[in-house]
Design a protein with these regions (language model features):
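Alpha-helix C-terminal capping segments
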Residues: 66-67, 98, 134-136
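Metal-dependent nucleotidyltransferase catalytic core
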Residues: 1-18, 34-39, 46-88
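Short gly/ser-rich loop at a beta-strand->alpha-helix junction or flexible surface loop bordering the NTP-binding
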Residues: 23-32
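Hydrophobic, well-structured mid-protein blocks that either form specific transmembrane helices
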Residues: 86-127
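A general structural signal for short secondary-structure boundary/capping elements
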Residues: 73-76, 89-96, 122-123, 194-195, ...
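Secondary-structure boundary/capping signal
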Residues: 23, 53, 71-72, 167, ...
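Conserved nucleotidyltransferase catalytic core and NTase-mimicking acidic/glycine-rich helix/loop elements
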Residues: 9, 110-224
Length: 224
């Protein structure tokens, strides 16, 4: 697996060399940032420049093409003003799931009010509900189901934040803070990450239906 501490140091140094004073922020998101990475995990980077144009995107591409494990590099590239104009409900997860490497993005905190967090939770739950029904009827995909359970953990984090005022990244700690229904979703996601059943139908029907049931009775009702 990637030595992520050394990798992000190399990444940030390469970005500073390419963009100089225009580089405002570098960070790490995703499973590596949360300590949940596996051998196949993407490296989700964040880079914020003073502004972003097509030439900058090309420069960024040339830089990451020279890095080790290029095939794993994913993430977010933006200009400062574009980030400030972003939908606040999206900024909630963006801010709290990002580990700063160079600089900070604290100026977006003022945009993330309670209404934005509630909107993030409710829209996330609605999207999961729709996708669960679609998957059960048509796709019958284990990969989609695993992705929906992963998405649900972020909805649970948002709901928990509205209750406690604190963001809990670690899933084990999060499971200890939430209701039984949400805890079961977290545990099921953890189990799905550990081993893959032969096919979609091989999964206990409870695991398929529990996530679907949790959406209307969970965040969509608990968040006004």
């Amino acid at each position: 697996m990637v030595d992520i501490r050394e990798w992000v140091k190399t990444f940030s140094a390469a970005m500073e060399e390419a963009f100089g004073d225009r580089l405002l922020f570098t960070g790490l998101q995703g499973s590596y940032g949360r300590g949940e990475a596996t051998e196949d995990s993407d490296i989700d980077t964040v880079v914020i420049l003073d502004h972003l144009d097509a030439a900058d995107i090309k420069t960024y591409e040339q830089v990451i093409d020279r890095l080790d494990r290029r095939e794993l590099v994913c993430g977010f590239l933006s200009g400062r003003q574009e980030l400030l104009n972003w939908e606040p409900s999206d900024l909630f997860q963006f801010y709290y799931d990002t580990i700063p490497v160079m600089g900070n993005i604290d100026e977006i905190l003022s945009l993330i009010d309670l209404e934005a967090i509630e909107r993030a939770a409710k829209s996330g739950a609605c999207n999961i509900y729709h996708a669960c029904v679609h998957n059960m009827l048509y796709e019958k995909s284990l990969d989609i189901l695993k992705g929906l359970y992963k998405a649900a953990t972020f909805v649970i984090r948002a709901v928990s934040f509205t209750d406690t005022g604190e963001y809990t990244s670690d899933l084990i700690s999060l499971a200890e803070e939430v209701c039984l229904q949400d805890r079961n979703i977290i545990y099921t996601f953890s189990k799905l990450r550990e081993g893959r059943p032969a096919d979609f139908e091989g999964i206990d029907v409870y695991k398929r239906q529990a996530l679907w049931d949790a959406c209307p009775t969970g965040a969509t009702e608990r968040i006004p």
